[in-house]
Amino acid sequence: MLPENGRILCALVILFLIFSFAVASLPRNISTSSFQAGGSASLGKDVQEAKAKLQAGINTWDSELLKTARDLFINCLMKSKADNAYILYHIALADYRLIAFYLSSKMNDEAEKSLIEAQKYLEKCMALDPSFGEANALYGYLLGFEIALHPEKAMTLGPAGFNYFSKALAKEPENPRIHLLQGISLFYTPQEYGGGADKAMESLTKAVNLFEKEAIVDPFKPSWGKEEAYTYLAAAYKQKKNYEKAKELLKKALEVNPDFGLARKELSGLEKSS
């Protein structure tokens, strides 16, 4: 029979082996930041609920749903045991959607407030997880919104935005949302400043191809954008007057998300004009 000290040591060794096996068995696509947030099933469900609400707001272009989604992400952050890079990112993502809504509605003061909030949360996110390239890409896109609000800053913010996209791609070259955000940015950037439909098509085609391979399991990770990649690629083809290809891509966008209002509106317009 083992002496008392020997039995304690044996028990500790067994516990260590059990713990080591459990850690080795964890899915590799679950990030450290998910565990920092508590990694609980209930928090994961809360994040998924907030994501669904945000997507509903995007589908219908409803600012109240977008604001509700943001509040839900804030609640998730408050429930987490520590700051979580993915939750911080999603708060900024909700602000990004609100900025787009406010700018399209000529509500520049509201857009300015949301921009400040989005940048604040993304700066925290990037500091918490420097390897999270997608946060850099979203920050770069936000600088485009800042230029829209303050055109006099274009000479400094324009190159800064490209720099953030370069850093994002260096960190996560196979992330489809980085290519999507870059493609949208290039689509709205005049050709003489390095943008245009052709440049946008390169990034958006890459995004579409990467989205086809992506399978997100972790509920905390970003999972948006596939239908938008098809829709903006369609917009680039439309600008090049390739209307049949544009319609084909819009139909694919609606296969991904039948409720996506922008794709439905664009497809309806093309079908009426053809």
Predicted regions mapped to residue ranges:
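N-terminal secretory signal peptides that target proteins for export/translocation
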Residues: 1-6
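Short coil/linker segments at helix-helix boundaries
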Residues: 49-68, 94-125, 131, 138-167, ...
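Residue-level recognition of tetratricopeptide repeat
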Residues: 83-84, 132, 175, 214, ...
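Outer membrane beta-barrel transmembrane domains
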Residues: 234-238
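TPR alpha-solenoid repeat register
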Residues: 86-87, 135, 178, 217, ...
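N-terminal leader/linker segments that initiate helical-solenoid repeat arrays
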Residues: 23-100, 105
